Amino acid sequence: MRKKSGFTIVEQAIALVPEFENVVRKLDQQVTLRGQSKSTLNNYIRRIALCVVHFGRLPEQIDPEEINEYLVGLARDPKSPSRSSFKHMVYGLRYYFRLMGMNKNAIALPSLKKDTKLPIILNTKELKALFAAPTLLKHRIVLTLVYSAGLRGQEVINLKISDIDFERKTIHIRQSKFKKDRIVPLSEYLASGLKKYLQAENPHIWLFNGKEPDGRYSVKGLSWVMRESIKKTSISKEVSLHSLRHSYATHLLEQGINIVTLKELLGHASIITTMIYLHVAQCPLIKPHSPLDRLYNFTKDEDKV
C-alpha cells in the first residue's frame, strides 16, 4: 500500500509515530514464534498503520470510543476499502490489543459475521479460454497448475522444483496455510507442459523464479497474470486467482470425488469449509434405492433423476 508521497503507509506511520517501529518488530516476533502467517501479519500491520496515521498516536493511546467511532466511519463510508480490508483492520487491532495485554472489555471492537457468499466457478469452456490466453509459457503453466491441483497462491510460490515428482505423479505442498504438508496428484496433462517449461526457463530452486528477495515469484505477480489473462477472454464473471481453486473443488465433486477426500486435497482444517462446494456443485441426483439391488447389479436407467 504505497501513497502518492512514495512512502508506504507503514513508513508514514513510523515517521509520524517513531514508536510504531517497535510495535511492528514486536508483532513480527510474535508471529514468527507462533508460526503464524506472514501475509496475514502484513495485512494487520498495514491496517494498524492506517489507524496510527489517522490519529497520530499508537492504538493503546487512543480512547476506545474514538477507535469505535473511527471503525463505524470506515464501515459507513462508501469510499472505504473492501470488507476484507475492514476485517483485517478489526482483527489486526484485536491481535494488537491482546499482544499489549489490554482489557478486552475496554475495547468493544465489532464482531464480524462470516461472509456467506458462494464461490464463483468457471466452466470448462471458460477455463480452456483462460489457459490459452497467456503469451508466455510460464504464465500458462502457472494458471493451469493452480486449477489442476487446487492450490492457494502462497502454495504456488512456495513450490520448489524438488517438490514435483514426475515419476510418482505427485506434488508435495509444504507448510501450507495451516502449517501442514500434503501430497496432491500431478496432472498427467500438465506434467508434459511442466517439463517443457523447466527445459525452456531453467529455474533454480523455486519452481517459479521472480523478483522477491529470495528469488521466488510473488502472489501479486500471480494475481496480475490472472487479471491480464482474463482481459484476453470473453469471461465476464468477477473472478480472481482463487476462483481456480474453487473451480477445482467444484469440478471434482461433480466428477464423483467424496467430500472427505476433497477436504484433504484442499488442505482444509475443517470439513465445514469444504462443504460450501456442495452448494455450487451440480451433482446428479440419485433416487432412493435399496443397496440389495446394487449388490446384484439390478439397476435401471430410471434410477437417475
Briefly describe each language-model feature range.
Residues 1-305:
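Conserved catalytic core of the tyrosine transesterase superfamily
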